[in-house]
């Protein structure tokens, strides 16, 4: 991996992690395009850029990381549990799903779901929840079950949680923000596990590349969160649905 590769992958991770378009899917495609192998060193790199994306959430939502918000974080934890349990039980089977074909198909499926939800299930005027603090434990759990679909490569963790949140009555902005906060325990757990698994793969030889990826991912993720919320003030998720379908079709045509 070169420094340019590190910048490209760091930017892709930072930009896509919190959007409903699957950061994992984009990283898999980008790695294939750049000719990068899925070896231990490159896996360690992915751990670093995921960790920096987590920090972007903390910096964007410093006011949420307070003892006064314990009720909110209890709901976030409830939403985290289904994915944690299912992911742990079926970890081996999930790893076997990683392929460009699966990613492409799930891009298309996710895009169609977004279009259907936007067309038939959302009327922003009827939404009753505009702040993440107002979400109930039951709604949190339902969102958590929706997040299970993110275990399939190409589905998108953000996409599945946002769809779940929209269907239980959150506004578009509140759905996105709850997805951001839910990323903290999910990505935190995954990153901690991967760090323990790959810590021996970190060496002085690739510290510069790791550092470049870390900074790039953090800066882009920080800006991406802000731009995404601005986007949702004027637009719907229709664009993301169309993008997912087009991207998935392109993958099927050119990588199969």
From Swiss-Prot:
It is a multi-pass membrane protein. Belongs to the UppP family. Catalyzes the dephosphorylation of undecaprenyl diphosphate (UPP). Confers resistance to bacitracin. It comes from the Bacteria. It catalyses: di-trans,octa-cis-undecaprenyl diphosphate + H2O = di-trans,octa-cis-undecaprenyl phosphate + phosphate + H(+). GO terms for biological process: cell wall organization; peptidoglycan biosynthetic process; regulation of cell shape; response to antibiotic. Keywords: Antibiotic resistance, Cell inner membrane, Cell membrane, Cell shape, Cell wall biogenesis/degradation, Hydrolase, Membrane, Peptidoglycan synthesis, Transmembrane, Transmembrane helix. The lineage of its organism: Bacteria, Pseudomonadati, Campylobacterota, Epsilonproteobacteria, Campylobacterales. One of its GO terms (cellular component) is plasma membrane. Its EC number is 3.6.1.27. Disulfide bonds: none annotated. It is found in: Cell inner membrane. Bacitracin is thought to be involved in the inhibition of peptidoglycan synthesis by sequestering undecaprenyl diphosphate, thereby reducing the pool of lipid carrier available. The keyword Cell inner membrane applies. The chain crosses the membrane at residues 1-21, 39-59, 70-90, 97-117, 134-154, 176-196, 205-225, 235-255. One of its GO terms (molecular function) is undecaprenyl-diphosphatase activity. It is an enzyme of class 3 (hydrolase). This is Undecaprenyl-diphosphatase. InterPro entries: UppP. Its main location: membrane. The keyword Transmembrane helix applies.
């Amino acid at each position: 991996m070169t420094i340019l590769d590190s910048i490209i992958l760091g930017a892709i991770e930072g930009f896509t992690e919190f959007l409903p378009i699957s950061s994992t899917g984009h990283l898999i495609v980008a790695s294939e395009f750049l000719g990068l192998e899925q070896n231990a060193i490159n896996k360690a790199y992915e751990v670093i850029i995921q960790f920096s994306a987590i920090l972007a959430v903390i910096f964007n939502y410093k006011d949420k990381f307070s003892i006064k918000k314990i009720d909110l974080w209890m709901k976030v934890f409830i939403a985290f549990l289904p994915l944690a349990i299912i992911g742990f039980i079926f970890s081996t089977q999930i790893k076997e799903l990683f392929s460009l074909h699966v990613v492409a198909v799930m891009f298309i499926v996710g895009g169609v779901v977004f279009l259907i939800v936007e067309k038939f299930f959302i009327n922003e005027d009827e939404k009753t929840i505009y702040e993440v603090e107002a979400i109930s434990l039951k709604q949190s759990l339902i969102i958590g079950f929706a997040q299970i679909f993110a275990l399939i490569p190409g589905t998108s963790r953000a996409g599945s949680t946002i769809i779940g949140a929209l269907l239980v009555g959150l506004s578009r902005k509140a759905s996105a923000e709850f997805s951001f906060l839910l990323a903290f325990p999910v990505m935190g757990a995954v990153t901690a596990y991967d760090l323990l698994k790959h810590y021996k793969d970190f060496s002085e030889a690739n510290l510069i590349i790791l550092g470049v990826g870390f900074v790039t991912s953090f800066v882009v993720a920080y800006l991406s969160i802000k731009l995404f919320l601005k986007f949702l003030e004027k637009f719907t998720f229709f664009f993301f649905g169309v993008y997912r379908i087009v991207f998935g079709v392109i993958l099927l045509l050119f990588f199969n």
